[in-house]
């Protein structure tokens, strides 16, 4: 401040003081502020000398100021300068500035505190929100993980099963060498602890430390160490084999319970027992030997299992083959199949007795039996008592076969005899090679005949189930008084020998040569009755175990040099009946010695040069047997006297015909010294057509009563019959020497054996000529074939099977009949016909069994011998099975065509309750069944489809009908609204017209004028009748009064002019639907004073119809409209407010969430001046 300014300031202080004293005097006195101590000491003295003047004194001095001027001047001079300064405007401005600064600082402090507080609260809320969100997420995640843990584990097992599971390891603090695994880790699941199966099949020997004790493993770290330790010898598994190993828990090797069992699929049959042992094992205990090498039960079981497969695999076949043969050793099915080669196998048979219930008792004697067979066939394994099917394999090992004791039920007494037999057996076509030589009592038929049978044996089919395995036997039948392979039997009068006798001299010579070969060293045979059905060694002995064919290496021959008697062999199955004249044997008590097999065979040697092949390839996988039966009365002696005796012997082939079928055995020796070896056709094996397809032995002996072949052969009573191949099964099917067929749909067993017969079977007996086995064809007599045609196969055989039989050399099967006498010269399909049989001549007389002697002889064909008297005779009913057998074999004997057999179902004798149908009938039944099933299925499908259609149609109909109803309802609603609106408009217009017509001013004016002019009452009444009508007012639900009724209402001081009636002619309100009464006003314009009343009424009506009425209506309408519009506006405002609130809440939530992510929005801006903007919600 300048000096001039100060002077001005001091100069003006007085004026300012004066002005303050005048103008602002109350303010100054009100303050009463003590000035602060002045800086100058003189001012302090002045202030002490002049105390402050009170207000009232100030006023007084002001009043007396002119009176005391001197005193005023002195007082003004005493006013301190500080007061003036304080009271100055500048000081005041400074104070204001200071106050502003103080206010600003206080505001800043308050704002800072408030912002800090707000920021802390915001941070706290945000942290709480974040914590809440995190806690909620953790809870959700935990629930989700717990909920989906099982499915995740299963999915992990399925998809990542091969990913190795590594146990938790201390990677940071572990030694680097310890972290290295010796081998890949175990594929173990963490929860189940099941190791993977990929580590079991090893290519190199390793061992598992899990099987070692803790000492061998060192530091126990089961979760870290691998399953295989290096340089430790362990187990080596084959690539195709697996072993079941029970691993202990990897956590502890000393666990009490081992929870895991690792089992792999056994891909090799030799480890089946290992699987069983491992499953039964509860624990796996590891033992350590001295060399610290683990030795586990698994290794021991494995070592045992390596050597076990051969025993385990052959155990089933051994039990099936030799249940009673302790020394039989045969490799099992594991032997590789080779081509069929014959090995000479020497079989050692244990001598066993065959006890027979006999009438005459003789001391037991033994007779050594030579081995007469020259069959080289590989021994074959086949199931014994157990029905175990094994493929035919060669068995070049000598077997020790034990023959089981078989009791025979024959009345003729036979002693206990031990018959060592050379046994050969097969699997399926089980036939016996019977080389028994039979000798009978002297017969009437003259002529010594020497019957020679070749070493090649004919196939004979014998019924066999599991134990009835027929064996290749070269033993001779023995009677009570002699031990000789030639059994003497007494023929039965009822039996006939259906066979064919050769007529050609070359054929006779070949037969004689064969018989001479077999009968060279035969001992003397006594004439003793032999049991009719006894199962001697020459027959078909029973063996319970598996019997192998063991043909001897040397040809054993039996020569019967002299035949003095004729043997007549009879059989209930029409076995070969004949009489053989044999030379008497010089030694009746001895059997055929073993040395007989070593006698020279120069006279019978064959010049084919194929003897080795004959020795090796003789057996056609079937056992064959030679039955030398006596010729019946039709046996013709060719030569007698000095010539060597030749006997026409039909070598029969016994074939089982189950279910009561009769077969004529028609076989003979082959020409040119060669028996029928069946080299051209695969008919070496008997064609057996049994019920079981491909199983001959199972069907032939079906019942348990016929458990042995001996019992089957000895079913006859005291009738003496030769039981060489004749078998009587329970179904009363006689064993005939013919080939039956299997019921395997026309495929004979020979077809099975076709592949087994070598191509060089033509030289089986060193013959230059091949025997041709012919089926019965057109060359055989047709009438004879018609007699026996239906007996070659079972009656229930299908026609297709009969027609599809192999017919070599173009022969066609002949017609067959159902029964009756059947000549033996004809055969049907499957029966062997010797090629040297003359066609059309060789027949035989055949009787029906059980006819009690009534012989129905057929006229002999040319060249047929007349039967002897003893060939005919009464038949025992017990021999053939009783009247049921007779009834079975006594049907009409008329010739029946094959179509007759084919079109009807034949019922077997023993199966009358089980009718069998033919193939055509079965096919018709199948077709009918198929049609029925198809019809049922199609009907079901059609009904289901129709039901679906009905359901769809109902849905469519319901939808369409609903649509139509809704559409019609909408139309009806619109129509109703239109009608109602039209009616209401009409009603409103009508009412308005009536109102205006009634209250129109012109009418009332005219009425008033007329009333004023005319005084006549009658005229007025007439005028009222013309212009005025009764007033009717409708009372509706709306609260409005009629103007007319209101005007006509009675008032005070006015006379009654009208009469109002209420309740007449009610009407229904169209608005509320209620019925309301109607007010009727009568007497309008009438009163006590006629013209005055009329004038009053007209005046009142005119006053009611004032021009203000439309204005009132407009006003009311405007009020209503305003009220309605205000209501709508308010309603709309409320809706908008609610929407605004929702929008604001949404925006604020969004902003809050965005602020949680933004640091600036969370902590606020750095500039304090901008904080005021962020105190409020932005954007609102």
Swiss-Prot record:
Pfam family, one: IQ
Ranges where the record places region Disordered: 34-78, 283-324, 476-496, 786-820
CDD domains named in the record: IQCD
Highest taxon listed in the record's lineage: Eukaryota
SMART domains membership: IQ
Keyword Repeat: yes
BP term (GO), one: spermatid development
SUPFAM superfamilies: P-loop containing nucleoside triphosphate hydrolases (SSF52540)
One GO CC annotation: nucleus
Keyword terms: Developmental protein, Disease variant, Repeat
PANTHER family for this protein: IQ DOMAIN-CONTAINING PROTEIN N, MYOSIN MOTOR DOMAIN-CONTAINING PROTEIN
Quaternary structure annotation from Swiss-Prot or TrEMBL: Interacts with calmodulin.
Medical condition linked: Spermatogenic failure 78: An autosomal recessive, male infertility disorder characterized by a high proportion of sperm head anomalies, primarily tapered and microcephalic heads, and an abnormal acrosome structure.
Role played: Essential for spermiogenesis and fertilization. May be required for manchette assembly in elongating spermatids.
Protein name: IQ domain-containing protein N
Gene behind the chain: IQCN
